[in-house]
């Protein structure tokens, strides 16, 4: 518990140094700190995203075979599961990506710690058109929703059937949440979403060059 509080306190101290000592102001300090933290996670997040994209590409190629298994064993769930497992093993796939899950868990304390630091560490200062970063702002809420949609839309190997829901639902939830959180937190969401979108586009370009997109 003390370690967690120390981590949040460290991030708040860094935010204060950037805002006051460096003269960036709180708004710009939030953007710079968020970008710095996300950049430090690139070795992990890029590896996870690349693994996930390759896995999705393999699953997409197996879709016809998986559909055939479901049709052939429609009344026998056990046989359906066994055949699915066999097919996955033949193509080097596991039912769950353990390394991907572990990697996601490892980055959560960093990202959530930054969120907590900004939730309580942003004072009542102005930034651009925002008079008070400690209060919600409707324009920022809209921008947060748009950036969320952009980040989701940039993800590689998204099925057309799920595309609309995967893009719209998180965007709507982000908009509603941003209306109830401080502008500092909304600014963090926008920054991290734009970073995610840029990384996803770079990943799509890499996969396309590798012939897997």
Stretch-by-stretch model annotation:
Residues 1-213:
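Helix-loop-helix
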């Amino acid at each position: 518990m003390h370690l967690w509080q120390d981590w949040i306190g460290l991030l708040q101290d860094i935010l204060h140094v950037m805002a006051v000592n460096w003269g960036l102001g709180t708004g710009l300090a939030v953007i710079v700190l968020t970008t710095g933290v996300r950049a430090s996670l690139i070795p992990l997040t890029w590896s996870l995203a690349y693994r996930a994209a390759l896995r999705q590409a393999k699953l997409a190629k197996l879709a016809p075979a998986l559909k055939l298994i479901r049709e052939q064993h429609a009344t026998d769930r056990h046989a359906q599961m066994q055949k699915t497992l066999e097919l996955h093993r033949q193509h080097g796939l596991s039912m769950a990506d353990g390394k991907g899950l572990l990697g996601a868990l490892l980055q959560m304390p960093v990202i959530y710690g930054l969120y907590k630091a900004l939730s309580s560490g942003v004072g009542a200062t102005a930034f651009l058109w925002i008079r008070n970063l400690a209060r919600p702002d409707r324009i920022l809420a809209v921008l947060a929703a748009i950036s969320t949609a952009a980040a989701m839309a940039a993800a590689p190997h998204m099925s057309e059937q799920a595309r609309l829901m995967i893009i719209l639902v998180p965007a709507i939830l982000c908009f509603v949440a941003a209306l109830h959180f401080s502008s500092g937190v909304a600014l963090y969401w926008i920054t991290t979403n734009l970073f995610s979108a840029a990384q996803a586009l770079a990943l799509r370009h890499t996969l396309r060059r590798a012939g897997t997109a």
